[in-house]
Amino acid sequence: MINFIACIDFEGLKGKNIYFESKYHDQTKQGFTQSYNNDYVLFRHNGSDENLDLFTKKDGKFLVFTKIFEEDKITLIKKLGINENVNIKDSELMLELYFKFGAAGMKCLSNGFIFILIDLIKENVMAFRDHIGIKNICYLHSDNSIYLSSSFRNLFNVNNKNFSLNLDKMDNFLNFKDSSNTNTFINEINKVPPSHFIEYHQDQIKVIQYSEYRLEDNLATANDQINGLKHLLKKSVYIDKSCKYSKIGFTMSGGIDSSTVISFFREFKDSAHKIFSFSAQYKHLDKKILNLIDESEYQNEINKSTDIYDTSFDGQDESTLSKLDFYLEVIGQPFFFPNLYLPNKAFSLASEKDVYLMMNGNDGDTVVSHGYEYFQELFYNLRWIKLLKEIDVTSRLRKQSRRFIFKRIILNSFSLSNFFNFSAKKKHLDVICSSNHTKAIEIQGLLASYYGIEERYPFYNRELIEYCLNVTPDLKNKHGQARYILKEAIKGIVPEKIRKRVTKANLGHALCLSFVVKDNELINAQLSKPNPAIRELIDLEDLRSSWENMKVDPRKYATNSLVPSRIFAYVVLNRWLDSLPLKLKKLENKTQNVYLHPYE
């Protein structure tokens, strides 16, 4: 929910015309309410004096801006040996952490954070981003100055700047190859990657990694590993101990992850928080696909509790493309999030009920893992008898053929180079470090901020992620059960009907229907008028043909088809290009290089 923008120029800001009033105001009508400026720094934000302060220490003069969560503040106070009764600002606490441990001290924080340290004497700037990217930092290097902000949009609105389109990113976006977590659709604007910081000194920028996840052998017994996971799940949902918020909301799909978050909070909370759940239902769809999408029977297992204030909405009434201009205004650049209407509707309803703290079960399946990388490890290490046994029991439990499971898990990702060189843990780590998670958090975070909501992701707790990475691989998928260790850890807390489910809703059916019924006019209009910048990047005739076929039989494209995704990506990008300001004068077929430096 923190929003900021800053300009630092150690040659002096005098004579520079810097305009930081955003052209966009969120629903809370709260712009940049706080400001700091001197001859070299202009900093505007919507936080408090907890977030930004000036310090004179160790013969230096430092401007510090930070945003940390309460749980991490408690941890840091203990780590630094500070008396709990001492009233210390977040900014001073983070400065003390840096003085004592340097950049490596940031590993002490388990949740989202921002830490910006401006050394006014040595003329040095450092901007740190958390381990997974819950908090965002964008930067723009221009005219001997560096601009920092919590959002792309803030920097794109800076006056008197000429920007150029990043055509490489556009191409990758359209072809689902955009794996970068540093660049944006504008060459001049970049992002600090998760677990990294940028250092700006003598008009040069370095991007430096300050931490990485540890992989190590786990010698604990299976039972101890299960109990360890249960402990960390409890710890990760134990938020707002000071009861700053009287109400806490939960996005509740009815899946295992969202059900785990709300169930653990409800089971272990020792506060008077009121619990609100927000769920999408699809009860009015054709009966042929109703059971493939609607999860209300699972949602009701949670929402029937008398201490939960349930708010359900009809997912059929919503679509992302029908409000595309709104999303582009909030996010500022193209995005790939076809089901964005779900968190948006939840945030909207939450704000109406004065719920301004929300918990989200995002990516529990990624963090804990379904465990199929264990099957791959067995295959590449020639443990084929064990592999066949695991596939056989999985086949019987999921009612899928052994051939289908083998093809999907082994053959579809087969590589000769993996033989005798494949590690299930390293594969899990690669998935965790994918840029997809960071991008999804950024997008949801901007939406949450629009409604004045602070969003929390218990499964993205750093300690929990590292623990799950090091769980023995055969505990992640055992006896045919994906995420076996999670299902054991939540036993007795999450309703059995949810804990034992082996299916998952396929929202692709809802997406295809909304395209054909609700978004047909917009899609046709965008396909008929491609922006000149996009024509050389995509086969429009093929896409138009696929769209016409999809309108005839949308159900055919709801599973294992890239057509809906291709249409969504094209429409979003094309609409954004048409809405660009006149200041975007040139096209450049390049991606700005971001050089990563090892932390010393």
Residue ranges and their predicted role:
Residues M1-F4, I8-F10, A104, E188-P193, ...:
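Adenosyl-5′-phosphate
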Residues M1-G315, L321-L324, P343, Y595-Y599:
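Cysteine-centered catalytic environments shared across enzyme families
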Residues N38, S110-I114, Y245-I248, S312-S369, ...:
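Conserved adenosine/adenylate-binding substructure
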Residues D90, L109, N166, Q225-L229, ...:
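Hydrophobic (often cysteine-bearing) scaffold residues that line and stabilize catalytic clefts
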Residues G102, S151, R383-L387, V494:
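Short, solvent-exposed helix-helix connector turns and helix-capping sites enriched
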Residues S263-E267, S348, L573:
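Short, well-ordered alpha-helices that flank and scaffold nucleotide-derived cofactor binding pockets
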Residues L324-E329, E373-Q376, L513-V516:
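Short low-complexity, flexible loop/linker segments enriched in glycine and/or proline
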Residues V367-D392:
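A mobile, often basic/glycine-rich helix-loop segment
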